[in-house]
């Protein structure tokens, strides 16, 4: 084995010289230069500095403006809530531990950080599944006269939390476990060991199949059908141009969210699967650190995509920030009006950009 396994940790370095120490008790500066921990702390501070305001603003603006409280926006708000969980439960913890060079908060802190990071990522994934299914139901109309309403949105929200909890909770109760990973100042699922009594193998397979592959298959199926339906509707002119444009633009926004999710999380999933299937192989601490912390940037991109692609939301946000006035009133107002009109005939009741 090209690593050192101890009680509730695995360090990717063989302890031939006796310098390897528990990541809960000693700085891990023998793994990488101390400057790397300082850089990691600065990166986490940047994510907090950006992630909290933008996600909080998304929640506040939607609550403040009644016209934004549409059923589909409930799912988008769910993403913002999940991101705030990651910011407060994960990013602050990681910033603090990286400043010390090891997981100074102990086992309890590791469990909490790993739980919030996993929960936030899974809520984001299952929210994208709900959005994809909603787009498929609205645009492809497998059920005649289906309208995505408030009850559907609430059921979708409940579904995302149940599924995310089904992935994040088991390691807290003995099916697998959360351990420090990478530079040993953040925690994740134990892909590294076959520790007796934790059934890591079965949990990792369950997680990859049920909480990564199946959601992605559903998303790709829905958007494959959606693209076909949009082309057919455009060719047959079955709906007004306004309705078609509204549906296309909402769908485009959600597709971009899905692509951004894949860009952020696929490297982490790929590295985790490699480590799981090559346990005992040689790899450095940065091998998991880079994809893990790149994935954490997902807390920023969804609200950014929503703000950039939804002119009605952007108009409301500027109005809120400027104390009820929009300095770009003429151009933003015109766009907002047109989009709101498009939304009124759109069966999704969403005002896209």
UniProtKB/Swiss-Prot annotation:
Residues exposed to the Cytoplasmic side: 62-73, 134-152, 225-252, 309-353
GO molecular function: 11-cis retinal binding; G protein-coupled photoreceptor activity
Feature: compositional bias, Low complexity: 334-353
TM annotation in the entry: 37-61, 74-96, 111-133, 153-173, 203-224, 253-274, 287-308
Cell location: Membrane; Cell projection, Cilium, Photoreceptor outer segment
Residues with lipid group (S-palmitoyl cysteine): 322-323
Motif ('Ionic lock' involved in activated form stabilization): 134-136
Site positions per UniProt: Plays an important role in the conformation switch to the active conformation: 113
Ranges per topology, Extracellular: 1-36, 97-110, 174-202, 275-286
Cysteine-cysteine disulfides: 110-187
Cellular component, GO annotation: membrane; photoreceptor disc membrane; plasma membrane
Chain residue ranges for the region called Disordered: 330-353
First-listed, main subcellular location of the protein, grouped into a coarse class: membrane
Post-translational modification as stated in the protein's UniProt record: Phosphorylated on some or all of the serine and threonine residues present in the C-terminal region. Contains one covalently linked retinal chromophore.
Keywords assigned: Cell projection, Chromophore, Disulfide bond, G-protein coupled receptor, Glycoprotein, Lipoprotein, Membrane, Palmitate, Phosphoprotein, Photoreceptor protein, Receptor, Retinal protein, Sensory transduction, Transducer, Transmembrane, Transmembrane helix, Vision
Cited function: Photoreceptor required for image-forming vision at low light intensity. While most salt water fish species use retinal as chromophore, most freshwater fish use 3-dehydroretinal, or a mixture of retinal and 3-dehydroretinal. Light-induced isomerization of 11-cis to all-trans retinal triggers a conformational change that activates signaling via G-proteins. Subsequent receptor phosphorylation mediates displacement of the bound G-protein alpha subunit by arrestin and terminates signaling.
Family designation: Belongs to the G-protein coupled receptor 1 family. Opsin subfamily.
Protein name: Rhodopsin
Source species of the chain: Mugil cephalus
Gene behind this protein: rho
């Amino acid at each position: 084995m090209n690593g050192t396994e101890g009680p509730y940790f695995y360090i990717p370095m063989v302890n031939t010289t006796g310098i390897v120490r528990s990541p809960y008790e000693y700085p891990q500066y023998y793994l990488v230069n101390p400057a790397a921990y300082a850089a990691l702390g600065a990166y986490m501070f940047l994510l907090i500095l950006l992630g909290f305001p933008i996600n909080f603003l998304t929640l506040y603006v939607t609550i403040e403006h009644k016209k934004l409280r549409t059923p589909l926006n409930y799912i988008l708000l769910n993403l913002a809530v999940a991101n705030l969980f990651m910011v407060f439960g994960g990013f602050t913890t990681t910033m603090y531990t990286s400043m010390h060079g090891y997981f100074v908060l102990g086992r309890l802190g590791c469990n909490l950080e790993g739980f919030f990071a996993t929960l936030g990522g899974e809520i984001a994934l299952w929210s994208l599944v709900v959005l994809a299914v909603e787009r498929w139901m609205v645009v492809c109309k497998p059920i005649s006269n289906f309208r995505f309403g408030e009850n559907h949105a609430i059921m979708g929200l409940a579904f995302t939390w149940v599924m995310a909890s089904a992935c994040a909770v088991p390691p807290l109760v003995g099916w697998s476990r959360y351990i420090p990973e990478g530079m040993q100042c953040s925690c994740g699922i134990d892909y590294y060991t076959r520790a007796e009594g934790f059934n890591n193998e079965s949990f990792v397979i369950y997680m990859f199949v049920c909480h990564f592959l199946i959601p992605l298959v559903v998303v790709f199926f829905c958007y494959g059908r959606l693209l076909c339906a949009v082309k057919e509707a455009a060719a047959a002119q079955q709906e007004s141009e306004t309705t078609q444009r509204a549906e296309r633009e909402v769908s485009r926004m959600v597709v971009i969210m899905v692509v951004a999710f894949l860009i952020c999380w696929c490297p982490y999933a790929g590295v985790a699967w490699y480590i799981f299937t090559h346990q005992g192989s040689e790899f450095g601490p940065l091998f998991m650190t880079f994809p893990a912390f790149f994935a954490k940037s997902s807390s920023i991109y969804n609200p950014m995509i929503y703000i950039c692609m939804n002119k009605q939301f952007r108009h409301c946000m500027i109005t809120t920030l400027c104390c009820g006035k929009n300095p770009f009133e003429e151009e933003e107002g015109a766009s907002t009006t047109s989009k709101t009109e498009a939304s009124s005939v759109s069966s999704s009741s969403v005002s896209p950009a």
